[in-house]
Amino acid sequence: MEAVQQNHSVCRGYCGVMLRSRSGGFFRRGFMLGNVEVILARPRGFCAGVERAVRTLESVASRYAGTREVYALHEIVHNLHVVNSFKKMGVKFVSALHEVPEGAVLVFSAHGVSQQVKEESRRKGLTVVDATCPLVTKVHLEIQRYDKSGYQVILVGHKGHREVEGSMGQVSNPVVLVQNVQDVQSIKIPSAAKLAYVTQTTLSMDDTAEIISALKLRFPRIVGPDLRDICYATQNRQTAVKAMSQMVDVVLAIGSKNSSNSNRLLDLAKAQNARAYLIDSYRNIDLEWLIGARRIGITAGASAPEILVQEVIDYLGLHANLKVRTMDGVSENITFKLPELD
């Protein structure tokens, strides 16, 4: 929906401004959507690992502002708003180490990196700050422990995801990746091999349950981590969006298209509610999605900041008489200590 004329700071109610929808129809700004209840998912948005990574990069950018160049290997988290905010602070995002000059400051993203990347960073004399999520680091340590004990490690995850790439590079021996039940049936493992599995942290217990069951069925002696090692944030957000989606007419999931966990929230919302949309910000909202809706649910991926949620609420308030409440759910009080800066 784009405005022929709009003034967000002035127009808070019925302003008589005509809006053009993406399909070409016109609507009048104001309370065109009538009375609408907005239900906010609990929990939503930043998890502790993302919060730690963002605060770490903020600290690094502030400390070295004007004195040394600060680089981040890949996006610090998968969110366009966050990345653009850091670019404005002068942080340079790169996709490979050869783009980082010797002697620069380099921050590893929340998704973690391989041992090879760490070693190459040392050889280049970089000042490295590791913002890897502690739960990802825990998976790395499990892979190393299993490998040292003679196990063939199987990783349940998505090919090409930054976290998976880093996890598979923790040991010199090959780590076998399985993405689905079909992979479990097709992988070739020596019958005498000791097997252990780990999982990508941004997959919930629900996401991995079928694959793990298939692994245990085919390899009855396979071992794996304690269920408490599953990322709490992924599970909590998925549980919340499934419950919220049953309460509302439309779901708006805030997150970037390259965010694995945000896309999963969208999938789960669609499974419960056909009217569900992934948006980077309020600017992506087409008001035609919301016509006839009396309850709108809002969730946000683990890498989406709360400011984006508030901006969506403010935008909806331009077009409806809003009542906003937060659903009952899990309250997360976990924080991770920031890495020390030299």
Curated annotation (Swiss-Prot):
Biological processes annotated in GO: dimethylallyl diphosphate biosynthetic process; isopentenyl diphosphate biosynthetic process, methylerythritol 4-phosphate pathway; terpenoid biosynthetic process
Homology family: Belongs to the IspH family.
UniProt EC number: 1.17.7.4
CDD domains named among the record's database cross-references: lytB_ispH
Catalytic function, reaction form: isopentenyl diphosphate + 2 oxidized [2Fe-2S]-[ferredoxin] + H2O = (2E)-4-hydroxy-3-methylbut-2-enyl diphosphate + 2 reduced [2Fe-2S]-[ferredoxin] + 2 H(+); dimethylallyl diphosphate + 2 oxidized [2Fe-2S]-[ferredoxin] + H2O = (2E)-4-hydroxy-3-methylbut-2-enyl diphosphate + 2 reduced [2Fe-2S]-[ferredoxin] + 2 H(+)
Residues that hold isopentenyl diphosphate according to the record: H78, H111, H161, S259, S260, N261, S303
Annotated active site: E163 (proton donor)
PANTHER family: 4-HYDROXY-3-METHYLBUT-2-ENYL DIPHOSPHATE REDUCTASE
Cofactor(s) it depends on: [4Fe-4S] cluster
Listed pathway(s): Isoprenoid biosynthesis; dimethylallyl diphosphate biosynthesis; dimethylallyl diphosphate from (2E)-4-hydroxy-3-methylbutenyl diphosphate: step 1/1; Isoprenoid biosynthesis; isopentenyl diphosphate biosynthesis via DXP pathway; isopentenyl diphosphate from 1-deoxy-D-xylulose 5-phosphate: step 6/6
Keyword Repeat: no
Cofactor note: Binds 1 [4Fe-4S] cluster per subunit.
GO MF annotation list: 4 iron, 4 sulfur cluster binding; 4-hydroxy-3-methylbut-2-enyl diphosphate reductase activity; metal ion binding
Role description: Catalyzes the conversion of 1-hydroxy-2-methyl-2-(E)-butenyl 4-diphosphate (HMBPP) into a mixture of isopentenyl diphosphate (IPP) and dimethylallyl diphosphate (DMAPP). Acts in the terminal step of the DOXP/MEP pathway for isoprenoid precursor biosynthesis.
Listed Pfam families: LYTB (PF02401)
Keywords for this protein: 4Fe-4S, Iron, Iron-sulfur, Isoprene biosynthesis, Metal-binding, Oxidoreductase
Domain of life: Bacteria
Chain sites annotated for binding (2E)-4-hydroxy-3-methylbut-2-enyl diphosphate: H78, H111, H161, T201, S259, S260, N261, S303
Name of the featured protein: 4-hydroxy-3-methylbut-2-enyl diphosphate reductase
Ligand binding (dimethylallyl diphosphate): H78, H111, H161, S259, S260, N261, S303
InterPro entries associated with the record: LytB/IspH
